[in-house]
Swiss-Prot record:
It comes from Homo sapiens (Human). GO terms for molecular function: semaphorin receptor activity. It is a single-pass type I membrane protein. This is Plexin-A3. Belongs to the plexin family. InterPro entries: Ig-like_fold, Ig_E-set, IPT_dom, Plexin, Plexin_cytoplasmic_RasGAP_dom, Plexin_RBD, Plexin_repeat, PSI.
Amino acid sequence: MPSVCLLLLLFLAVGGALGNRPFRAFVVTDTTLTHLAVHRVTGEVFVGAVNRVFKLAPNLTELRAHVTGPVEDNARCYPPPSMRVCAHRLAPVDNINKLLLIDYAARRLVACGSIWQGICQFLRLDDLFKLGEPHHRKEHYLSGAQEPDSMAGVIVEQGQGPSKLFVGTAVDGKSEYFPTLSSRKLISDEDSADMFSLVYQDEFVSSQIKIPSDTLSLYPAFDIYYIYGFVSASFVYFLTLQLDTQQTLLDTAGEKFFTSKIVRMCAGDSEFYSYVEFPIGCSWRGVEYRLVQSAHLAKPGLLLAQALGVPADEDVLFTIFSQGQKNRASPPRQTILCLFTLSNINAHIRRRIQSCYRGEGTLALPWLLNKELPCINTPMQINGNFCGLVLNQPLGGLHVIEGLPLLADSTDGMASVAAYTYRQHSVVFIGTRSGSLKKVRVDGFQDAHLYETVPVVDGSPILRDLLFSPDHRHIYLLSEKQVSQLPVETCEQYQSCAACLGSGDPHCGWCVLRHRCCREGACLGASAPHGFAEELSKCVQVRVRPNNVSVTSPGVQLTVTLHNVPDLSAGVSCAFEAAAENEAVLLPSGELLCPSPSLQELRALTRGHGATRTVRLQLLSKETGVRFAGADFVFYNCSVLQSCMSCVGSPYPCHWCKYRHTCTSRPHECSFQEGRVHSPEGCPEILPSGDLLIPVGVMQPLTLRAKNLPQPQSGQKNYECVVRVQGRQQRVPAVRFNSSSVQCQNASYSYEGDEHGDTELDFSVVWDGDFPIDKPPSFRALLYKCWAQRPSCGLCLKADPRFNCGWCISEHRCQLRTHCPAPKTNWMHLSQKGTRCSHPRITQIHPLVGPKEGGTRVTIVGENLGLLSREVGLRVAGVRCNSIPAEYISAERIVCEMEESLVPSPPPGPVELCVGDCSADFRTQSEQVYSFVTPTFDQVSPSRGPASGGTRLTISGSSLDAGSRVTVTVRDSECQFVRRDAKAIVCISPLSTLGPSQAPITLAIDRANISSPGLIYTYTQDPTVTRLEPTWSIINGSTAITVSGTHLLTVQEPRVRAKYRGIETTNTCQVINDTAMLCKAPGIFLGRPQPRAQGEHPDEFGFLLDHVQTARSLNRSSFTYYPDPSFEPLGPSGVLDVKPGSHVVLKGKNLIPAAAGSSRLNYTVLIGGQPCSLTVSDTQLLCDSPSQTGRQPVMVLVGGLEFWLGTLHISAERALTLPAMMGLAAGGGLLLLAITAVLVAYKRKTQDADRTLKRLQLQMDNLESRVALECKEAFAELQTDINELTNHMDEVQIPFLDYRTYAVRVLFPGIEAHPVLKELDTPPNVEKALRLFGQLLHSRAFVLTFIHTLEAQSSFSMRDRGTVASLTMVALQSRLDYATGLLKQLLADLIEKNLESKNHPKLLLRRTESVAEKMLTNWFTFLLHKFLKECAGEPLFLLYCAIKQQMEKGPIDAITGEARYSLSEDKLIRQQIDYKTLTLHCVCPENEGSAQVPVKVLNCDSITQAKDKLLDTVYKGIPYSQRPKAEDMDLEWRQGRMTRIILQDEDVTTKIECDWKRLNSLAHYQVTDGSLVALVPKQVSAYNMANSFTFTRSLSRYESLLRTASSPDSLRSRAPMITPDQETGTKLWHLVKNHDHADHREGDRGSKMVSEIYLTRLLATKGTLQKFVDDLFETVFSTAHRGSALPLAIKYMFDFLDEQADQRQISDPDVRHTWKSNCLPLRFWVNVIKNPQFVFDIHKNSITDACLSVVAQTFMDSCSTSEHRLGKDSPSNKLLYAKDIPNYKSWVERYYRDIAKMASISDQDMDAYLVEQSRLHASDFSVLSALNELYFYVTKYRQEILTALDRDASCRKHKLRQKLEQIISLVSSDS
């Protein structure tokens, strides 16, 4: 059965509390999950989905999948098409599972879907076999509604009788067809006609409730949505959501309100007389929550039951509500968890029934016609089990039953709930719309504790079905694509007792002696006293006395007191972190004695940790071997404290040695008794005395008050003052006068620059060279310059008085008194009485005009404007202006307020200012003049606006910019000021307190009040919006909306607004007339990649109509946003060739939104700037190409979006002239004659070749028939071996390399430890540069320029091209979609270059001469890994195994690598070798006591060859890298208990003849059949040691020759096992001597003709391996093989090559065939076939390599389109497969045809696939390392790259050169 899901028993990493703990998940990719059911006994999980039902094991392993759809159907067909021919067109329709119930009595699953009007299937629980699917009667159709969560059902078992199904469902307006609630029979026979029939039905009553059609005619949208159903006692309950008909208006377009209700019926009531429904809800902090989302029935824990005052076996209902009553489909995220007791609900219902039967009120069921029918007084006794009568029913509740709020949430959106009781606690689990699981402990209605939140599925909502496993140890969560199994507790995540017991998880307790958080049942010793803690106060408490020790005091005995510990008589050890453990002494009192660490351990513990090191003293239980408790312990180190105050102020007993300037814990260490200080009062210290102020350049001493200053002793240096400023240090000798005073000697100090008037410096007093005296924290030393930043007298005198700066009049400079000549008369200081600065100057005044009434605040700026505001006198234009002290800035700025001018028409004038008296030196006036004006206004525009205000008014007049303050008043309200100039004031009109009316306007400019009689502003009725058309847009917005309303002309700047997920957007509107305006819809920010197809609804949608609040959010709006349209480019290259006037088809998606109504998107298509007429469909636009020719750009405009699709190449057909036609005819005739002559000559030549070919072919046929029997026997034997291998493979699997190793071996052949495999360790600036370089690589223009520039360099070698290609692909692996676009562009450029250079098109991609070709190889490497593992890897591995086993059946020369059996002539032994097969019994190296392993070897095998065969057999199925190597093992021949002989290739028994030394073989040692051997670790013999130097030297000489770039495998892969030692004159040989030796030359080996006997061996080997070669070729050249589909990458790349050929008008099929062959088989498959070690963890020897090369060559020949002419010079491998290649060629051609016929892959689908591939392997390589390697080429070709970036227009536009230069600069800064 085809799998429809991707089953991931994923170890999905969960964030949050789960950390990295895994949980299981079942994930689907091609369907949507809807419902979940868990078997209450077996724990099996059943999942309902769209078109599927799954059965899963409890661990979520898929057991069965049952297909339920799609089905041919039409929603309008009733009865469904399965019963009667339907008049409506049928189409495949998805079957959405809406109900999934387990019928335990009948051992079956009830699965109800949406097709055929809602039929159900009965599925056998064991295997989901369909037992029945009733669909013949109307009772079988439950409802055709499509919503998956609108139905709920309950099965009620009835003992001996059939079970009943109570089912509630939404009916989607079809109440005449479906009851909304019914009770139906569940017959044991699924084919029974009574299945699903109503439990009771006669002509008057039945077991059903229907929504009256009159209700639907009034409220077409009315429906009842069933959320949850359950049984309690003898009642059946349903929680529902239904339209609130009392709040919802009859207008269908109006806003809809919903209410939640609980429905109750008696389970045994077949007439539904007991139907009662009550509104329910919850309130919290005054906010109502009325939209029920989910519910769960449970028992309360004992603590909750006690808090509620109900029995512990009472049923309670945990319920989730969303806030408000709107947006049922997309409810608000503000949600609440509430609790109802069933007893309370039943009490409300009982009281309601009793009141109705007393005749009080009406039936009050709003959606029934008889809702206003009065209750009939019927005296009778009504108790809690009353099930109704024929009267007073159905009944509705009058008041809302309020739940108890437990937990509110406003972010995640709670969506589902489940609960159960654990011990005394109620534990509630909540799924959220953000994809997380919340865990809540509820111990009371005011005691709900959210103790854990676990992310499960990022961004995907958890659906309603939240279920427990039968043992309540796991919980199953359902989302649209995933079922997740999470443990109900994750106690082990808590690492301490406090974290464990403080988490709030009731499942968790602390297992004391095992120091772990777990359930009590998982704790060994939990039953012992204090063995298991469940309360925080019961955690182990540890107290240590003393709790600190000096680092100089080792081995102190510590007393440890323990509380809350179990019996410790088994013993306890103490340990200080890494220090050694010491056994503790257990005292009778229960206390422990532990020694502190030794001196050596203390040094290790405290080194580098400063003054204190807090270490954990840990106690280890000898009973459990676990460290179960501990306490912090402090080791203090006084010696690191460098000052007296820090030393004696330490909390530890530290003492300061004054004369040694050291801190110690040992007071006796001080040299002098009087030098010891043990309290802060005795410390030498500079006393606080204010800031130390030092003028620059003044030679002066500095005296400081101090205390306890030590007197330097003999040999100690005196005091010094050390000053550090601006990085410079100045040391000044100082004198200690006594213990309380010190003076720095005469010195001057300075700092550079005048940017600052003062600067703080680092000042300290030291003695004896470097012993600083402590300073108080508040001590500051300031160095200052009087003249810096104080250029005027006023600024000088307002300097800090402490600086004692004054103004030197003669010098015009701010200086100290001592620096000013004649200071008594020439130096001014603020302390001097009457000091004032002369020559004030005004530089600016503002404003320059004002009303004569005064009140204008004039700001005057200048210098020397007085030192106090009271000493400044001002007149402005002759009028007094009063200074405002609060705004005065000494000497710099004065703000004054004008008095009224009493002159009728006052003239303008300057500002006059006096400082003190008005003598000439202290008086000034401004150059600017101030003028008096009379402001007036005479017009307001607009003259009318809405009563809510918000209109932008422009009041026009003259001199309106006068004064400093302006107030506009409309009637009695202030108009909000915006701006003004001389001719106009702009303000925003206020709200009219009188509503629509006329209002006067007045102005107040400072103290001038201005009015304009007769000028009136009219407040009108507020505008309203009554209708929108259309009520939808696209995500981008900017589509036209026609708005109907009233009074729209009064709106000045209307805008339309939308608010979505908290983000508000707006767009413009244009008013057309008073009742209509045209708007452009605002776009919304989606926040996720794809919008829903059914559209997105904004949280708010409305209009900004000035300040009209009622239009901001239209309550009745159902505005919808649909996905934006998107278009495909015109072609891969963006150019499409068409004829003039032909149709142009533009393909796209979402071109017609799925919106109701006739409105459509308005598309404009511009071709060459000219619009064309359009025809629009769902997926394409059709327009006519214009009449112009040439290249015309194509652009599509829609809704503010612009799509540039490419270029149309419009080419007209031109008729040929008569001379041209005659010339063509003549030329054609000549050409025909030339072709005829060539063909005649060619025919003669080919006839000779054909005769030679036929002769050779005949020889081959004869030889092949002669060896057919041998081939058959050899194949049968090999097939037996391979069958054994494949059987073993089923157990151990093929040794595939991991993705990372595989990719590195292909991308960087021969480099196993490439830098990209490890993270780069680099300085921060280089790392930053590389990250910027990585960003630059995401610029297509840069990468293309970069690569093309490198390729243009003559020194850029082939190896460099491959390296750059590989590094680029690694660097871009996280963006494979982008890398693919780059690759396509590079390939397109390569094709263009190939054609321009007149090269034959078939040469394209043949060799790796460009970066693009290697990138293509790497691209396939990345994307075909999965195909290799799942499909092609197996036949390739079997071929490798077959070759290896077949080769090893015959002799193989260890020196030359030649073999008896070979596909390669070059590796064929040309002599007769006598050999016998031996079976050795090998002792397993790792377990000599296990069974011996029989191994077949040849007696002519060298010892190393024998070891390899033994290792292959003993470690069968083990990857090569994980098993021992032959060179690391010795072969030991055991001839008895005592006789053991080490066999070696060379030893003292080795035979030497002349100068030839023969390798030892098994025959040399006379090893017999059945011998016992063993592989033992290598032993170095004297002989080996003597020869190791010679052998190593010889090996190193051959290594460079034998290692090739095609294989990253070790030297053993390519080289013979033993290398001849020619330097010593002795030549090694094994089976045959080297062919180059004169005495043994067999003839001319250069000849390609093979003698008959050797060709026979080649043919025999070829025939034996034929099936394995065929299997591999068939797999590779099949579009669907072994259940695997064709990889997307192959189809996508082949289509790209076809498109390139189409664009370049290459119609030759051979060229296209060759391109594809060069692209995939040549570039990828040949590489993999020749080097299987790229894919598998194997060892490839030289003979296997040679045979694989023959297979790879055959593979290449099969892909070629040219005919292979065989002759006497043809290679043997071409002769070998001459008969097979035509067949293989047909496979290749069929393969290419099949791919071409397949549906194209869209760029979007390919991008999605590539993004997923990037995600899967995002962390496999170090991108930073790849960028670092790639940057080498930037460095090497720096200038060329920068020049190329300058030349490229696109690079210049994006300033790519500057960006690269920035990177180069960053890197260079580190060098």
